[in-house]
Amino acid sequence: MEADIQLMRLIQEMRAEIHKLEKENQALRMKLTASSQRASGSGRESGDEREEEAPGQSPATLQGAVSTDAAPAVQEHQGNVMIVRRYSISSSVCSSAVNDPWKSGKSHPKSGILEGQRTLKSLACSPIKKQDMEEKVFATDSLTSNRTSQRASPEHVCGCRDKTKAVSFLLPMDMSSYSKNSSSLKHSPNQATNQLSIIAE
């Protein structure tokens, strides 16, 4: 019984609060309609003044006004363009691109493309640098194991690297599979350098 009485009191209190809020809401709506009517009245007066000033202007100035109104739409359309760039697999190019991001983004300084390019460059350069470090470690291991076979092979490797051209897209990698691949590269020092160039490219 006491619980029912408490629930009835809570319901009555909530109804009283609802009535208060409804009254406040109606008062605010009345104020809003009054202010919107005042704003519409002042807007009509300013619109009439503009219409009176418009016949005095020449058609050239009217065309200029139309062209300036159409310009932001063109800029918005340019802001939606996606720029795709191709980067070589060398750490020097990546470091220069990260140090000087304005070279690639001077054409669109006001758009939000620069921030996206900076993040893409930083993401692209970090796996490339890791791959270069692993290539250097593997190259030193293979140099110590078989120097005689490598004396004839660098020209062949350089020729192959000059001839082959590929477009690569660097995506976020799964670190577990990446570590497995790197460990398999490190534990196989008997591979030839031309196989290393094929894996790296």
UniProtKB/Swiss-Prot annotation:
Originating species: Homo sapiens
Keyword terms of this UniProt record: Coiled coil
Lineage summary: Eukaryota, Metazoa, Chordata, Craniata, Vertebrata
Low complexity bias locations: 179-188
Protein name: Coiled-coil domain-containing protein 195
Segments for region (Disordered): 28-72, 179-201
Coiled-coil regions, chain positions: 4-38
Polar residues compositional bias, start-end: 189-201
